[in-house]
Amino acid sequence: CVMATPAIENIVNFYNGVQITFIGSFVSIEAMKNHPKSVKTVVLDKKYSALYKTAKNLGKFDAFFSFRSSFRTKFLKFFIAAQNKYQFDKNKYINCHQVKKYNDFVNDALSIDTTPRKLKLCMQNQSSDVIQKPLLGINPGASYGSAKRWYPQEFAKVASELSSQYDVIIFGGPGEKDIAMDIEKLLIEKGVSNYQNLAGNTTIPDLINHISKLDLFITGDSGPMHVAAAF
């Protein structure tokens, strides 16, 4: 969802006074729910009966945009009541970055010619923390499992080397608590104490807020990588 944010901003700029209902997975909704144009959010159930019920209960829209090309989203689109419906076609937009693919999709749908701007995520108002030292975030998780994951000892080595210049925050989802704990143990062995291990203990909005305050972020190919690119 993060890589669709420039395209979403072009939709916002196209429709005067637009109000947006965001529909999607729990993670995508958590990331987008603080958008200033959001008036409603709906987390989708994967069951087709639930998709049908959701579509029928949402009411009418002037336009419906789907940035997914799965059969489920086509099913949802069919039953959504909207004057205009647009669906991303992954077979049409190829050989370019995902951000540009989504932006080209919106350009074609609205017959406009815009270039994608910076990724954008909106946060709730957060209290300003007093930061004593620059912050380094490390995120050992990666999309598609261990094949794209760097070793815990390598993360720990880098974090240890940089700990004199940065305070360290370890990030990770519930499924990455073990690897985060391995990194924490290695940091303790190296005498590093200026760290926090937040793996498995952040909501999506919390994660976005923490990442927005980092000075340096080291991660594999992951969702938090795309979040960091927005700041």
Task: Locate the predicted segments by residue.
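Catalytic machinery of carbohydrate-active enzymes
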Residues: C1-F231
